[in-house]
């Protein structure tokens, strides 16, 4: 069975891993980095992903960041003169990760396990699966990020029984999961979180502070200047990271804008104490989900054996202190918070292929599921933290006499009224025979698969007629749209490959011209004019083809030059070999003379 890669598709950074033997290994990107910025740029018709895209974010307005926060919505982003869905942008990131994983493995990759925040709803999970499909990946499993982290942490501890709390604060989302580990079973007991809390929010607090201070001093609002704002974002992220290691950092942004008197510079120092003060409310927001998860799991703090930190934002000292204060435990630092999720996803890939034995993953649904009933009430069929996959049925009836149809309004959430929860979809069961109110028996069945994706069936028990749908939110993509996007992605991949081929050819031409000119110069006056003239002629023809920019012509002329240059090199080699042989002959003669002299022995004659 071909390899299944594990992908952590993050808000700010992503990572890809693969199982090698029994070890999960992070695959470094072409720049040698173990994580890749989740950034996409468009320039001159080219799609740029990762570190290169992040570097040009300041100067290139066609740059998309933190697209994960829009997954599961109908919100599109404008770039490159087009509008893109969040799924398409995410697919570009996935395609890039897939590409360098293939380069590392030396084989095609067609399957992946992709992680999502535990608190992602059905629409967000479906959007992630669609992004994988657009990128040319068969998504074998959607796994919750904290669960994947627990897999990576617990793989070498399958003989131990312990309860762990995973505290996952990423770039844009926050999750807390409580798991029980024992005998190779990873059982998620409860999960809670906040999809609108992450490292980006900590950066924003610094940005807001810098903007306010600069406005106070100079009367100019930097938040209205796109380029200045991007520079502020980069500076804020760097300052946040610096303050994890030092107690004070300097923020220096020369020529940030211009005033009436000329250019203005931003020079400011930020202390860790000030940063903690600015972000106090964000740190406070992490506490409620911790308490919620513990309550749902029915556990006290004393029953938690280990606390695992996941996500780059858990390096913030105030966050670490808050975790210690809330759990009463020193966090376990045996895992890399940036890499552990992708590693866990790769392990789950190994479970699917059978390379990892005796491991069972029991995940849960993060939010309750149900339907709207009379009076706009939300009636739950499946409670949050139910182990998945699962199925649950309940019988309902009509609300009016002779009602010919029922509308099934499917919802996800925890609020008592339907209007306050997330609509997953609507469908209708028709042709119900005329009968007094309350007589028809309508059975509604919810199914949640191992990926947390929902399907709903409504059945009239009297007529056995049923209506079945896999939930597709209003913000979801149709199969036709996914197919079109897949074709676009494939076309882009072909265009990118062609562009790379062009660049490689041009580099090869430059190298050949340089090497041949050097050889011609070195062989001047050494007696092989025929070969030198042929190489010079081929060189001139290649230069002319290079000037014209005709790739086919360049390729043909490059082959011709290589042939002539090789002939010249052979002559040079023959001459050098002959010279060496002659030199060895001279040395041999001298050695013989020396040997002959050695045969004469000096002796002493003693007269007696």
UniProtKB/Swiss-Prot annotation:
- Could you name the domain of life of the organism this protein comes from? Bacteria
* RNA-binding found in the keyword field: no
| Classification via SUPFAM superfamilies | Actin-like ATPase domain, Heat shock protein 70kD (HSP70), C-terminal subdomain, Heat shock protein 70kD (HSP70), peptide-binding domain
Residues modified as Phosphothreonine: 173
Induction of its expression = By stress conditions e.g. heat shock.
Swiss-Prot/TrEMBL keywords: ATP-binding, Chaperone, Nucleotide-binding, Phosphoprotein, Stress response
Locate the compositionally biased regions of type Acidic residues.
599-608
Kindly give the NCBIfam families that the UniProt entry links to this protein. PRK00290.1, prok_dnaK
PANTHER family, A to Z? HEAT SHOCK PROTEIN 70KDA
Q: What is this protein called?
A: Chaperone protein DnaK
Instruction: Tell me what organism the protein belongs to.
Output: Streptococcus pyogenes serotype M3 (strain ATCC BAA-595 / MGAS315)
């Amino acid at each position: 069975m071909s390899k299944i890669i594990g992908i952590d598709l993050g808000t700010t950074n992503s990572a890809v891993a693969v199982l090698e033997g029994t070890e999960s290994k992070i695959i470094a990107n072409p720049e040698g980095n173990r994580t890749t910025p989740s950034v996409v740029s468009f320039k001159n018709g080219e799609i740029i992903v990762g570190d290169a895209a992040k570097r040009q974010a300041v100067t290139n307005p066609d740059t998309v960041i933190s697209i994960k926060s829009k997954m599961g919505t109908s919100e599109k982003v404008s770039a490159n003169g087009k509008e893109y869905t969040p799924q398409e942008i995410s697919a570009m990131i996935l395609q890039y990760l897939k590409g360098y994983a293939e380069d590392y493995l030396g084989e095609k990759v067609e399957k992946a396990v992709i992680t999502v925040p535990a608190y992602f709803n059905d629409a967000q999970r479906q959007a992630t699966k669609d992004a994988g499909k657009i990128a040319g990946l068969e998504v074998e499993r959607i796994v919750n990020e904290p669960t994947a982290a627990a897999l990576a942490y617990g793989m070498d501890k399958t003989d131990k029984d312990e309860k762990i709390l995973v505290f996952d604060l990423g770039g844009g989302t926050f999750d807390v999961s409580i798991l029980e580990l024992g005998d190779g079973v990873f059982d998620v007991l409860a999960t809670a979180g906040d999809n609108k809390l992450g490292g980006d929010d900590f950066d924003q607090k610094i940005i807001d502070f810098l903007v306010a201070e600069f406005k106070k001093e100079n009367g100019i609002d930097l938040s209205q200047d796109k380029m200045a704002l991007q520079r502020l974002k980069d500076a804020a992220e760097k300052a946040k990271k610096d303050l994890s290691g030092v107690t004070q950092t300097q923020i220096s942004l020369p020529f940030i804008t211009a005033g009436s008197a000329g250019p203005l510079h931003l020079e400011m120092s930020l202390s860790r104490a000030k940063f903690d003060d600015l972000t106090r409310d964000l740190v406070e927001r992490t506490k409620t989900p911790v308490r919620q998860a513990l309550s749902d799991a029915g556990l006290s703090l004393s029953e938690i054996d280990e606390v695992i930190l996941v996500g780059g934002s858990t390096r913030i000292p105030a966050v670490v202190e808050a975790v210690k204060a809330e759990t009463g435990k020193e966090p376990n630092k045996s895992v890399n918070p940036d890499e552990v999720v992708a590693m866990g996803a790769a392990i789950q890939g190994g479970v699917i292929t059978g390379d990892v034995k005796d491991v069972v993953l029991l995940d849960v649904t993060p939010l309750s599921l149900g339907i709207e009933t009379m009076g706009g009430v939300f009636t739950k069929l499946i409670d949050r933290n139910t182990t998945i996959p699962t199925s649950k049925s309940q019988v309902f009836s009509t609300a009016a006499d002779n009602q010919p149809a029922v509308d099934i309004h499917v919802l996800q959430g925890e609020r008592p009224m339907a209007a306050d929860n997330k609509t997953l979809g609507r469908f209708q069961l028709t042709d119900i025979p005329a009968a007094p109110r309350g007589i028809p028996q309508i059975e509604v069945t919810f199914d949640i698969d191992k990926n947390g994706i929902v399907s709903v069936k409504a059945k009239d028990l009297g007529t056995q007629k049923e209506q079945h749908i896999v939930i597709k939110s209003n913000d979801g993509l149709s199969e036709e749209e996914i197919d079109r996007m897949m074709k676009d992605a494939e076309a882009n991949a072909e265009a990118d490959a062609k562009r790379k081929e062009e660049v490689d050819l041009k580099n090869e031409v430059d190298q050949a011209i340089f090497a041949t000119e050097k050889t011609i110069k070195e062989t001047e006056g050494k007696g092989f004019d025929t070969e030198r003239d042929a190489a010079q002629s081929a060189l001139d023809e290649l230069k002319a083809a290079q000037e014209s920019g005709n790739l086919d012509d360049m390729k043909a002329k490059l082959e011709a030059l290589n042939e002539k240059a090789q002939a010249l090199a052979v002559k040079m080699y023959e001459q050098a070999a002959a010279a060496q042989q002659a030199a060895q002959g001279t040395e041999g003669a001298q050695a013989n003379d020396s040997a002959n002299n050695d045969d004469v022995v000096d002796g002493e004659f003693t007269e007696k």
